[in-house]
Amino acid sequence: MLSILNPTTLLSALAALPMLTSASPTGTIPAGPQFAKREISCNSNYEGYAFFYFSNRDENIYLAASNGNDALSFTELNNGKPILTSTKGDGGVRDPFILRSHEGDKFYILATDLCIGCGTSWGDAQRFGSRYLEIWESKDLINWSAQHHVEVSPDNYGNTWAPEAYYDDDLKTYVVYWASGIYDNEANPNHDPIEYQRMVYATTDDFITFSEPKIWQDEPPNGRIDSTVIKADGVYYRFTKATINGCADIVEESSTSLTAGLEDWHQIASCIGKNAGTQEVEGPSIFKTNCKDVNGARYILLADEFGGNGYVPLESSDLAGGKWTLRTGYKYPESPRHGTIIPLTLEELEGIQKAFVNTD
């Protein structure tokens, strides 16, 4: 998702691409409870990865497979053509997020319903954008269901961007979260001026029926977008695009409750991308590498250098420490944008490589 935090700077930011810069870094913040560094637990059954993303080429979903058990080396599949396209809503899909079901028997893809390339402006996309999520499911990552066009936002929400989901063991359901600008339709029926972005969440058991959304993160005037979450040793770690002390970048926070309000999340680090040496970034995506990964078990935080390079990997062996290092020497598809890397079994990896084999 294009970085949009303070709506008053939207037009100037668009005009400045790809020369956008962040304010000075603020560094690591030792706030909140300190969690002891632990050995990284991992699943020895996973022997590769799939990478789902959209591209600077268009607003569709693409797929790459890892070259062996290496989270830093991928080959784009299907002759570089998308594996999923939208036939509903705005006609484009961005920010695809994939998760394995809690039972482990299927996969879900959630994506943003948005097509800037079809003529929608970023301003209109925030004022009267889609209130829907685009959702697919599959048992094998090869054969996908029909597209589900699911309304999750009420009519006073201006957009529904960059959805992700995480299974909450306490609530026994999936928590789905996304960014929206929220308006007072009576006082501001034209949704002008544009509202700042908030992170909201809803719950679902089946990705068909959703609860009414609730506000999760509300931080005016700059707002928050693009949250991604991982759980380790009973603690949730959340990474979000936000402006902290003048630095519009990725912030890391922790909490023992996934749905806790902003005040109950403890800030670990801010300005993560710039501190690591990236260009301006958004669209963070966090995952844990496999036990047998050629570079060992660790955490990788993907960050989207949306000015042109796409995803770059940052690494850490300690989520609680808040120190992230920009990795070099990786091999990703050309300019992959906001998406997800998911661990696979060898059978799953070989399955997608065969089904979407490159023939050109």
Regions found by a protein language model. Give the residues of each.
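Carbohydrate-active catalytic/glycan-binding domains of CAZyme proteins
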Residues: 27-360
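Fungal secretory targeting signals
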Residues: 1-37
